[in-house]
A protein has these predicted regions:
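Structural alpha-beta junctions
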Residues: 30-42, 63-74, 126-133
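Active-site-proximal specificity loops/subdomain of glycosyltransferases
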Residues: 48-103
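Conserved catalytic core of nucleotide-sugar-dependent glycosyltransferases
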Residues: 81-89, 94-95, 112-181
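Short, well-formed alpha-helical segments that are part of the catalytic scaffolds
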Residues: 16-37
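Short beta-strand-to-loop acidic/aromatic patch adjacent to the donor-nucleotide binding site
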Residues: 99-114
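Short helix-terminating capping/connector loops at secondary-structure junctions
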Residues: 2-3, 36-43, 100
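Hydrophobic targeting segments
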Residues: 5-10, 29, 42-47
Length: 181
């Protein structure tokens, strides 16, 4: 069954992760070969966060992303107060996606998408009754921040899959570096 809605799930809170989202994840989603190339879909950025981070997120979205349709959901809006916030956010977006017959893309703030990757995944899966999952390598945030990736994203330059693979191999997270020992 073909679907004409895409929900982008963004669970993000805390200064470090909000900055990562605005510096890397959101610009990578907005590369011309990703969300802009899916204009025939209704796309909603579903942001799940804490109450004290809402204004910072709204400011970041209003600065350069005025054409994005977004919805912010907070922990207190959902009416729960236990410690398993991420699980509750996850259940909520799964339910909404199912009820509204929307395709779902996970976009945690530590993900960087190559140009065309979202478009390709949507076109590959839509209407076929399948899901696509792709593991992403953990990388050193210090290593990435020392690169010119942030500058390239701000200048709307295309970020290729090849470049991201090289970036991940050059900036391995410590847990990956010693995984085979």
């Amino acid at each position: 069954m073909y679907r004409d809605k895409i929900y982008i799930w963004v669970p993000v809170w805390g200064e470090k992760h909000i900055n990562m989202f605005f510096d890397y994840t959101l610009p990578s989603l907005c590369q011309k070969g990703n969300l802009p190339s899916l204009s025939n879909y209704e796309i909603v950025l579903n942001i799940y966060t804490l109450d004290n981070d809402v204004n910072r997120i709204k400011e970041g979205l209003s600065d350069a992303y005025t054409d994005l349709n977004f919805k912010i959901t907070t922990k207190s809006e959902m009416g729960f107060h236990d410690n398993d916030m991420m699980l509750m956010f996850y259940r909520d977006i799964l339910k909404k996606s199912y009820e509204n017959r929307a395709l779902l893309v996970f976009a945690q703030p530590d993900l960087i998408f190559s140009d065309g990757s979202i478009f390709n995944a949507i076109e590959l899966a839509n209407g076929k009754g399948v899901s696509i999952a792709a593991a992403h390598p953990r990388i050193s945030t210090e290593g990435v921040s020392a690169t010119d990736l942030k500058k390239k994203l701000k200048l709307d330059q295309s970020i290729s899959s090849r470049m991201l693979v090289k970036l991940s191999m050059d900036n391995k997270h410590s847990s990956l570096e010693y995984a085979s020992d």
